[in-house]
Amino acid sequence: MNDLSTATPEQPPIVEVQDMRVTFGSQNVLRGVALSVPRGQSLAIIGESGCGKTVLLKTVIGLVRPTSGVVRFCGYNLAELSDRELTRQRVRFGYVFQNAALFDSLTVGQNVAFPLRQHKSESPSRIRELVLARLAEVGLPNSVISKKPAELSGGMRKRVALARALIMNPELMLYDEPTTGLDPIMSDVINELMLRTRNQHDVTSIIVTHDMRTAHKVADRVVMIYPVNRLEPDEPQLIFDGTPDELKACGDRRVLQFVRGEAGERLAEMHQASSDREPQS
């Protein structure tokens, strides 16, 4: 397996995570996570539901603060930034939430323009121009600008969310399950838009996904997170780090079962856990 986690001097990491741990109460979600993402890379984070993928994504933008360890963006230790400084850095991110997270009471145009109005001083005509340009970029006609999110299909809402994420010309794009709930064709449309976004805007991308088609098509690097509660005490939580082709050839049975969608041992574990809870006669 190639070591893709070490950035070269010519390509310093845009994101760097060092020995990070995240706990919520007594629940250990992330443990000893180390990750370095060079500029321009497209990284897919895969793993079972509840293993900590989205939590990791949120630590990258400072929405979740690690219990211990360090998260850096462009060299800044996010834990050391004030709220004002952190807000200033977040302008450099674009985030596409799993459910699109559009404001239901706002029109499409107002949703896409929201970051501009919060962080820039642009004229109404310039804002409209930028909004229409971003909508066109994701394949939406001008006519949607006055519609409310409830009037749109799931795929259209995802594209509006992408347009909003791009409106501030981010350096780093983060996608949380971007194809969840979409049919195969619309999922591929979103995959193509993510590829186009990376190529046209020269952005770094981090994609949390269960969709192996997305991981293979969009990413040039894949890491897999394994649930902490199913690891040995000293075992690393990132059980795979390599290219999509290396993922297909990986010999780790846990990785193969996930990639192939095979319940196998997981089903047996669930059955055993259920049996252990049954009252003794």
Residues covered by each model-derived region:
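Helix-to-loop junction immediately C-terminal to a conserved catalytic motif
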Residues: 61
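Conserved ABC transporter NBD signature motif
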Residues: 69-77
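Short coil-to-helix segment of the ABC ATPase nucleotide-binding domain corresponding to the Q-loop/switch region
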Residues: 105-114
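Conserved ABC ATPase signature
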Residues: 148-152, 156
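Conserved catalytic motifs of ABC-family nucleotide-binding domains
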Residues: 169
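Catalytic Walker B motif of ABC-type/P-loop ATPase nucleotide-binding domains
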Residues: 173-176
